[in-house]
Amino acid sequence: MPRSFLVKKHFNASKKPNYSELDTHTVIISPYLYESYSMPVIPQPEILSSGAYSPITVWTTAAPFHAQLPNGLSPLSGYSSSLGRVSPPPPSDTSSKDHSGSESPISDEEERLQSKLSDPHAIEAEKFQCNLCNKTYSTFSGLAKHKQLHCDAQSRKSFSCKYCDKEYVSLGALKMHIRTHTLPCVCKICGKAFSRPWLLQGHIRTHTGEKPFSCPHCNRAFADRSNLRAHLQTHSDVKKYQCKNCSKTFSRMSLLHKHEESGCCVAH
């Protein structure tokens, strides 16, 4: 930084600031109007016109707060802060006043809410019940999650098949099902139709003799991948299909059926 911008300021460390010379400003906000004690008033038309609250009085002075109160008035137990003390509103009865000043009775719902707020244990003991299935929950969040299930079920659309009576929750599932009726994949060699393209490809290999899926354990090859997976089970050590007559085990159910149909082991 250039030296022309530097300002040298002498500070006297021995001189301490006198905080008693500073004025203290205490702002007191109260919903009550002390008519016998004249004070500056901040006009607030929206409050004064309603008639529900008295004008807001403001003290700005360096004297202590207790010295400002009129005779016969003492500070009430309110909310303490650095700005002063705010007196609480008077206790309310079972009736309330509207903006016109007339009394209107409190509804049953408001009275029930006030009684619950005064007793925290009443909220915990209350059961939240679903108005659709009468199922109860101990918390409101649990009831809200349960009602979401009702909303999802009601908003869920069902798509019906025009060829049969089946219904699906998604349009994509319905389109896949309709292909089983229309069979759009047709073999050009024999005219056989299929619902899926990969089924047609596996069928065409039966005409061409192509067997691209070979077994890594033996020299057998297959035209379809699913046939290879079934063949690999014969090389597995796990053989969970057992013959009831000779207790011989097999890795595939189809091999067990062939064994039973051959009649090699007849029960005596």
UniProtKB/Swiss-Prot annotation:
Tissue specificity of this protein: Expressed in most adult human tissues, including spleen, thymus, prostate, testis, ovary, small intestine, colon, heart, brain, placenta, lung, liver, skeletal muscle, kidney and pancreas. Not detected in peripheral blood leukocyte. Expressed in the dermis and in all layers of the epidermis, with high levels of expression in the basal layers (at protein level). Expressed in osteoblasts (at protein level). Expressed in mesenchymal stem cells (at protein level). Expressed in breast tumor cells (at protein level).
Molecular function as annotated in GO: chromatin binding; DNA-binding transcription factor activity, RNA polymerase II-specific; DNA-binding transcription repressor activity, RNA polymerase II-specific; E-box binding; RNA polymerase II cis-regulatory region sequence-specific DNA binding; RNA polymerase II transcription regulatory region sequence-specific DNA binding; sequence-specific DNA binding; sequence-specific double-stranded DNA binding
Gene Ontology terms: cellular component: chromatin; cytosol; nucleoplasm; nucleus
Effect after changing S96A: Increases protein stability, nuclear accumulation and repressor activity on E-cadherin/CDH1 promoter
Resulting phenotype, R196E: Abolishes binding to KPNA2 and impairs binding to KPNB1, IPO7 and TMPO1
PTM per Swiss-Prot/TrEMBL: Phosphorylated by GSK3B. Once phosphorylated, it becomes a target for ubiquitination. Ubiquitinated by the SCF(FBXO11) complex; ubiquitination requires previous GSK3B-mediated SNAI2 phosphorylation.
Start-end of C2H2-type zinc fingers: 128-150, 159-181, 185-207, 213-235, 241-264
Keywords tagged on the record: Cytoplasm, Deafness, Developmental protein, DNA-binding, Metal-binding, Nucleus, Repeat, Repressor, Transcription, Transcription regulation, Ubl conjugation, Waardenburg syndrome, Zinc, Zinc-finger
Result when mutating D119E: In a patient with neural tube defects
Record note on domains: Repression activity depends on the C-terminal DNA-binding zinc fingers and on the N-terminal repression domain.
Subunit annotation: Interacts (via SNAG domain) with LIMD1 (via LIM domains), WTIP (via LIM domains) and AJUBA (via LIM domains). Interacts (via zinc fingers) with KPNA2, KPNB1, and TNPO1. May interact (via zinc fingers) with IPO7.
Protein's name in the database: Zinc finger protein SNAI2
Organism: Homo sapiens (Human)
